[in-house]
Amino acid sequence: MAATKTASYDEHFRPEKLREWPEPESVSLMEVLAREDIDEAVCAILFKENSIVKVTVPPFVDPLFQRQQEVDEERRTGLQCETGKRHSIKELEEIEKARLHASSPYFTFTSHCVIPKEWHKASARARSKTYKYSPEKLIYADKKQKRKEKKTADLSQAAFERQFLSSKLSQKNKVGERKGLVSRGLGRGWHAGLCSTHEQHILVPE
């Protein structure tokens, strides 16, 4: 077997066969380097894919939504135990609505007032207790309050006027006192001047 392989190899690479081979195409150095890089990258990717273990991650599930699904499933199983039939979520909601409507009290409203007369009387008593004052009394109390406010306003106005007058009088008194002091000073000076002139008149003849 090995002999046959070597024989075929020698036959393939004989000088006559090598002459029959086509001439190699001229390839640029950059193209050769790019092909080598691509080959290395492909080998690295294949090696990584073979060495890495692929793990399937389950999709994200909202915990609240999951809890709601569990509750719905429990309700469905409970209804199945009661009726002996498997129901969908929509059928379960319709059955629960019908049960709720049946359990709620039913009120019949007529054209007349539904509230009994005793309730009207009780509410009237409560209103009479809470509102002890009649409208006339309320108006009178309002007028009285306004009068009090007016009186207080008048008193404050009178007090202000008194204070203003007293301050004005005190200012006048101060001005009068100043004038009196000035006039006294002038009188004394005039009297002294007269005396000196009289003495001069008397002394001149001597």
Curated annotation (Swiss-Prot):
Belongs to the FAM228 family. This is Protein FAM228A. The lineage of its organism: Eukaryota, Metazoa, Chordata, Craniata, Vertebrata. The gene is FAM228A.
